[in-house]
Curated annotation (Swiss-Prot):
Keywords: ATP-binding, Magnesium, Multifunctional enzyme, Nucleotide-binding, Nucleotidyltransferase, Transferase. It comes from Escherichia coli O127:H6 (strain E2348/69 / EPEC). Residues 449-946 are annotated as: Adenylyl transferase. This is Bifunctional glutamine synthetase adenylyltransferase/adenylyl-removing enzyme. Involved in the regulation of glutamine synthetase GlnA, a key enzyme in the process to assimilate ammonia. When cellular nitrogen levels are high, the C-terminal adenylyl transferase (AT) inactivates GlnA by covalent transfer of an adenylyl group from ATP to specific tyrosine residue of GlnA, thus reducing its activity. Conversely, when nitrogen levels are low, the N-terminal adenylyl removase (AR) activates GlnA by removing the adenylyl group by phosphorolysis, increasing its activity. Pfam families: GlnD_UR_UTase (PF08335), GlnE (PF03710). Residues 1-440 are annotated as: Adenylyl removase.
Length: 946
C-alpha cells in the first residue's frame, strides 16, 4: 500500500485528536490510518460504531460479498415490528455496508467494476427489502390487491439510470418507476381499495421509508420524475397505462432513459417478463434509427448549456469529455442499432462498449480509450463522493481534498492527476465530436437562439439566471420561469404526440423571444400559456403559429393588450385563423355588410343541420368580435364606432336567428294564414337598452321584446295546424332557445325579455294592439323611459311603422313637469340603492352618481318632458344624438349638450377598455372627477331644482 503523502500525514494528526479511546492510534493498522485520513465519512462512521472497524480488520471486504447483502439485511430486519424500526434498520445497514465499500475502494482491494456492482446491489437490496416488508404490512391493513381472476398483484419497481445499469455511484439519488400488472381490488382487508389506491399509498410509504431524514440519516434520495407525465403523473401505473403512454407519447429522452431500466428483485417472474416484453419495442426499434443522433445531440446541448449556466467547471460527469459523454456515445449505438443487434441491448456500459467494438462500430483503439477513461472517471467520482458521502462531481478546490484524491488515485500530486484526467477527457471528447457533433462553433445569432431554446427546454429554476431575461425585474424573471415550468408540467398531462412536441419545441423559443422582449413579459406570457394549454393537443394550431411568424406577433400583441381577447382565443382556438390576415384582422366588417357576410358564412352549412347552424352563428360572432376588439386596441375605431359595429353585428345575428326559427316553425306548423293576404311575417323584434340605443359593449346582454299582428281567429296552414298566436309564442320561445343554447362555442347572447308588458309575468310575445294599449294605460313612467331607447331591430315594414307610431305617441304625451321629475328621480334613487357601488373608495362608471346611468336618465327625462312640444326629440334612440336634438331644439344649451356628450363617450370608452382587460366597471375614486362634477351639475339642474 502506498504511504500517505506529506499533506495527508500532517492531517492525520488532526484525525488522531478526534479518535475515541477504543481507537487509539497505536492500535490502528496502516490501512485503517490511511482510510480514516482519506474519508471524513469513514471517520464519522467508525467513531460512531468502533465495532465496524474490528469487523473490517477481521473480515476484509470481498469482491463477491454483494451476494450476501440480502441475507444479511433479512437477518437485520427479522425483529422489526413497525415502520420506524424498518427505517432505522435500513439506514444502519446502508451505512455499515457503505463503510465496507468505501474501505475496499480507498485501498483498491477490488476493481472499480466490482465497486459499481456492490453499490448497485446494495441499493437494490434495500429497495426490495423495504418493498416486501411494506407490501406485507399494507396487505394486512387493506387486503391483498388482486386482478379480476383473484390473483395477487405485486408492485414491480424499475430501477432507472445507473441503478438499472448496475453502475451506481457512491452518493447518488435513485431513479425509480413503480408499476402493477392489472386493475382490480383488494381482498381480505377491513376495507376494499382498488389496486391504484393500494399501490399509490404503498408507493408513498416506500418513498418515505427511503428518503425521509431521521437521526440515522436517510437511505437514498428517491427521484420519481422519470415516470410517465413526470411529477404531474400518477405515482404508480398499471401495465396497460404504461404501454399506452410509451406507444402514444414516449419521447426520445424517455427511450434513452429506458435503455438502462431494470426490474428490481426477482426479475424472472411472469409479470416481470411481461413488463420487459412490453417495453422492449419502445426502446429498441426493429429498424435502424438514425433520428436518435439529433435527439442525443439536443440532449447534450441542453446539458452543455446547464454546465455553462450553473458554472459547472471541473465537472467530471457533465463537462466536456466527462462521464455523460461516454454514456451518450454508447447509447447512440444502442438506440440506433439495438433493435437488430441483441448484443447491444445490455443495460451496463462496459459490456455494451465491448459489443460495439466487436461489431466494428468503433475502432478497437477508440473503444479501449473510452473503457479506460470511463473506469478512471468512475473511480475518481466515487472517491470524491466517499470523502463526505456527498453527491458531487466537481473537483475540489481545497488542498486537503486534492491531496486525498491524488493519493487514492495513486498519483504523486494534484497536477499529475489532472494531467492524466485531461488526457482521458480529451480522448472522450474527440470520439464524441466525431460521432455526435461539436456544439462549440456557433455564431452570435445561433448563440442567442440557443439561449431561447435553453429557456424553453432546460426547465430552469426560479433562482437560475439567464442573460435573455436580464432586463426584467427579479420578480418578473421569477414569474416567467415559473410560468414556463408550470406550462411544461401541464404538457406532461396531455396526449401531444411526437409531432406536436416537435412543433412546440420549434415554436416556443420564437414565442419566448418575442414575449420576453416586452416589459410586461410575465403578464403576457401568463395569458398566452393559458391559451396554448388549450391547443397543444391540436397540432394544426401550433403549426399555424409556428409557420406564420406574423400570426404569432399578432397573437402576442393582442394578448398583451387584452386578457379578454386572450380568453376568447383560449376558449375558441378556431379564432386563431383570423390572425393570418392583418388586413381583415384590424379592419372590421363595414357596418352595413354584417348581414350579407353572415348570410354568405351560413351558406357553407346545411340549412337543415341545426347544430352546425348554431355553431356557425357563434363562430361568426366570435370572429367579428375579435376583429372589432383588434381595431379598438389598435386605435382605428373610436368608442362610438365600436358600439356601432357591436350593434350591427347583434342585429345581423337577430336576423339570422329569427330566420332559422321561422323556417323550423313553418316546417312544423305551416304559416299563420293571415299572412296569405300580405307581405312579411307579421313579427317584429324590438331592441331596448344598449341595443336600442346603439351602445352595445363587448359583453352586453340583449334586451328584447317580441311583437306580432296576428288576428285572434288566425290558424296556421300546415298539417299540424295550431292557433296563429300560439305559433308566434312558439316562434319567440324558439328564438330564445337558439340564442341561449350552449354549444362548444358557447352561447350566442344572453337575452333579457323582461321589459315586455307586465314583465316576466307577461306573455313572451305581445300583439301590437296589446302593446299599444299597455303603454297608454298601464305602463309606469320607467317603462316610458325605456321606450326612449327602443327601436325595431327586426320586423316587416308594417309592424315597424306601427311600433314607431306607438312610441312617438307615448313619448309625446303631455306630462306634468314636477311629477315627471319626481318619478324619474325616485326611480334613479331606487336603482342606486339596489345597484350602486359596493366598493369603498371606487367609482362605478355606470351605476354611481355622476356616471353613465345619470346621463341616460337626464336625456330620457328631457325627451319625455318636452317631446309634446318638440316631437322631433323622438327621432333617435341613442343618447348622443338625443343630446344633439336637445341642443338643436333649444331645450339644452349647446355647450352643456356637448360637455355631456364628451363625458358620456369618455366614460363609455373606459368601460370598453376595462372589458378588454376583463376588469369590472369601477375605477379609483379620484378618476373622472371633472366628468362626474359636470354630470352632477346637470342632474341638479334638470332633476332636482324646480
Amino acid at each position: 500500500m502506498k504511504p500517505l503523502s506529506s499533506p495527508l500525514q500532517q492531517y492525520w494528526q488532526t484525525v488522531v485528536e478526534r479518535l475515541p479511546e477504543p481507537l487509539a492510534e497505536e492500535s490502528l493498522s496502516a490501512q485503517a490510518k490511511s482510510v480514516l485520513t482519506f474519508s471524513d465519512f469513514l471517520q464519522d462512521s467508525i467513531i460512531a460504531h468502533p465495532e465496524w472497524l474490528t469487523e473490517l480488520e477481521s473480515q476484509p471486504p470481498q469482491a463477491d460479498e454483494w451476494q450476501h447483502y440480502a441475507a444479511w439485511l433479512q437477518e437485520a430486519l427479522s425483529n422489526v415490528s413497525d415502520e420506524a424500526g424498518l427505517m432505522r434498520e435500513l439506514r444502519l445497514f446502508r451505512r455499515r455496508i457503505m463503510v465496507r465499500i468505501a474501505w475496499a475502494q480507498t485501498l483498491a482491494l477490488v476493481t472499480e467494476e466490482s465497486i459499481l456492482q456492490q453499490l448497485s446491489h446494495l441499493a437494490e437490496t434495500l429497495i426490495v427489502a423495504a418493498r416486501d416488508w411494506l407490501y406485507d404490512a399494507c396487505c394486512r391493513e387493506w387486503g391483498t390487491p388482486c386482478n379480476a381472476q383473484g390473483e395477487a398483484q405485486p408492485l414491480l419497481i424499475l430501477g432507472m439510470g445507473k441503478l438499472g445499469g448496475g453502475e451506481l455511484n457512491f452518493s447518488s439519488d435513485i431513479d425509480l418507476i413503480f408499476a402493477w400488472p392489472e386493475h382490480g381490488c383488494t381482498q381480505g382487508g377491513r376495507r376494499e381499495l382498488d389496486n391504484a389506491q393500494f399501490f399509490t399509498r404503498m408507493g408513498q410509504r416506500l418513498i418515505k421509508v427511503q428518503d425521509q431524514p431521521t437521526q440515522d440519516g436517510f437511505v437514498y434520495r428517491v427521484d420519481m420524475r422519470l415516470r410517465p407525465f413526470g411529477e404531474s403523473g400518477p405515482l404508480v401505473l398499471s401495465f396497460a397505462a404504461l404501454e399506452d403512454y410509451y406507444q402514444e407519447q414516449g419521447r426520445d429522452w424517455e427511450r434513452y432513459a429506458m435503455v438502462k431500466a431494470r426490474i428490481m428483485g426477482d426479475s424472472d417472474g411472469v409479470y416481470a417478463n411481461e413488463l420487459r416484453a412490453m417495453l422492449r419495442p419502445f426502446v429498441f426499434r426493429r429498424y435502424i434509427d438514425f433520428s436518435v443522433i439529433q435527439s442525443l445531440r439536443n440532449m447534450k446541448g441542453m446539458i452543455a448549456r446547464e454546465v455553462r449556466r450553473r458554472g459547472l467547471t471541473d465537472n467530471i460527469k457533465l463537462g466536456a469529455g466527462g462521464i455523460r459523454e461516454i454514456e451518450f456515445i454508447v447509447q447512440v449505438f444502442q438506440l440506433i442499432r439495438g433493435g437488430r443487434e441483441p448484443s447491444l441491448q445490455s443495460r451496463s456500459l462496459l459490456p455494451t462498449l465491448s459489443a460495439i467494438a466487436a461489431l466494428h462500430l468503433l475502432s478497437e483503439n477508440d473503444a479501449e480509450q473510452l473503457r479506460v477513461a470511463y473506469l478512471f472517471l468512475r473511480r475518481l467520482e466515487n472517491l470524491l463522493q466517499s470523502i463526505n458521502d456527498e453527491q458531487t462531481q466537481t473537483l475540489p478546490f481545497d488542498e486537503l481534498n486534492r491531496a486525498r484524491l491524488a493519493w487514492a488515485m495513486d498519483f504523486a500530486d494534484w497536477p499529475q492527476l489532472t494531467g492524466v484526467l485531461t488526457a482521458h477527457m480529451a480522448n472522450v471528447r474527440r470520439v464524441f465530436n466525431e460521432l455526435i457533433g461539436d456544439d462549440e462553433s456557433e455564431t452570435q445569432e445561433e448563440s442567442l437562439s440557443e439561449q431561447w431554446r435553453e429557456l424553453w427546454q432546460d426547465a430552469l429554476q426560479e433562482d437560475d439566471t439567464t442573460p435573455v431575461l436580464a432586463h426584467l425585474s427579479e420578480d418578473d424573471r421569477k414569474q416567467v420561469l415559473m410560468l414556463i415550468a408550470d406550462f411544461r408540467k401541464e404538457l406532461d398531462k396531455r396526449t401531444i404526440g411526437p409531432r406536436g412536441r416537435q412543433v412546440l419545441d420549434h415554436l416556443m423559443p420564437h414565442l419566448l423571444s418575442d414575449v420576453c422582449a416586452r416589459e410586461d413579459a410575465a403578464v403576457t406570457l401568463s395569458r398566452i400559456t393559458a391559451l396554448l394549454v388549450g391547443i397543444v393537443t391540436r397540432t394544426t394550431y401550433l403549426e399555424l403559429l409556428s409557420e406564420f411568424p406574423a400570426a404569432l406577433k399578432h397573437l402576442i400583441s393582442l394578448c398583451a393588450a387584452s386578457p379578454m381577447i386572450a380568453s376568447q382565443l383560449a376558449r375558441y382556438p378556431l379564432l386563431l385563423d383570423e390572425l393570418l390576415d392583418p388586413n381583415t384582422l384590424y379592419q372590421p366588417t363595414a357596418t352595413d355588410a354584417y348581414r350579407d357576410e353572415l348570410r354568405q358564412y351560413l351558406l357553407r352549412v346545411p340549412e337543415d343541420d341545426e347544430e352546425q347552424q348554431l355553431e356557425a352563428l357563434r363562430q361568426f360572432k366570435q370572429a367579428q368580435l375579435l376583429r372589432i376588439a383588434a381595431a379598438d386596441i389598435a386605435g382605428t375605431l373610436p368608442v362610438m364606432k365600436v358600439s356601432d359595429h357591436l350593434t350591427w353585428l347583434a342585429e345581423a345575428m337577430i336576423d339570422a336567428v329569427v330566420q332559422q326559427a321561422w323556417v323550423q316553425m313553418v316546417a312544423r306548423y305551416g304559416k299563420p294564414n293571415h299572412l296569405n293576404e300580405r307581405e312579411g311575417r307579421g313579427f317584429a323584434v324590438v331592441g331596448y337598452g344598449k341595443l336600442g340605443g346603439w351602445e352595445l359593449g363587448y359583453s352586453s346582454d340583449l334586451d328584447l321584446i317580441f311583437l306580432h299582428d296576428c288576428p285572434m281567429d288566425a290558424m296556421t296552414d300546415g298539417e299540424r295546424e295550431i292557433d296563429g298566436r300560439q305559433f308566434y309564442l312558439r316562434l319567440a320561445q324558439r328564438i330564445m332557445h337558439l340564442f341561449s343554447t350552449r354549444t362548444s362555442s358557447g352561447i350566442l347572447y344572453e337575452v333579457d325579455a323582461r321589459l315586455r308588458p307586465s314583465g316576466a309575468a307577461g306573455m313572451l310575445v305581445t300583439s301590437a294592439e296589446a302593446f299599444a294599449d299597455y303603454q297608454k294605460n298601464e305602463a309606469w313612467t320607467w317603462e316610458h323611459q325605456a321606450l326612449v331607447r327602443a327601436r325595431v331591430v327586426y320586423g316587416d315594414p308594417q309592424l315597424t311603422a306601427h311600433f314607431d307610431a306607438v312610441r312617438r305617441e307615448i313619448m309625446t304625451l303631455p306630462r306634468e313637469g314636477k311629477t315627471l321629475q319626481t318619478e324619474v328621480r325616485e326611480m334613479r334613487e331606487k336603482m342606486r340603492a339596489h345597484l350602486g357601488n359596493k366598493h369603498r373608495d371606487r367609482f362605478d362608471i355606470k351605476a354611481d352618481e355622476g356616471g353613465i346611468t345619470d346621463i341616460e336618465f337626464i336625456t330620457q327625462y328631457l325627451v319625455l318632458r318636452y317631446a309634446h312640444e318638440k316631437p322631433k326629440l323622438t327621432r333617435w334612440s341613442d343618447n348622443v344624438r338625443i343630446l344633439e336634438l336637445l341642443a338643436q331644439n333649444d331645450i339644452m344649451e349647446e355647450q352643456e349638450a356637448m360637455a355631456l356628450t364628451r363625458a358620456y363617450t369618455t366614460l363609455r370608452d373606459e368601460l370598453h377598455h376595462l372589458a378588454l382587460q376583463e376588469l369590472p366597471g369601477h375605477v379609483s375614486e379620484d378618476c373622472f372627477t371633472a366628468e362626474r362634477e359636470l354630470v352632477r351639475a346637470s342632474w341638479q339642474k334638470w332633476l332636482v331644482e324646480e
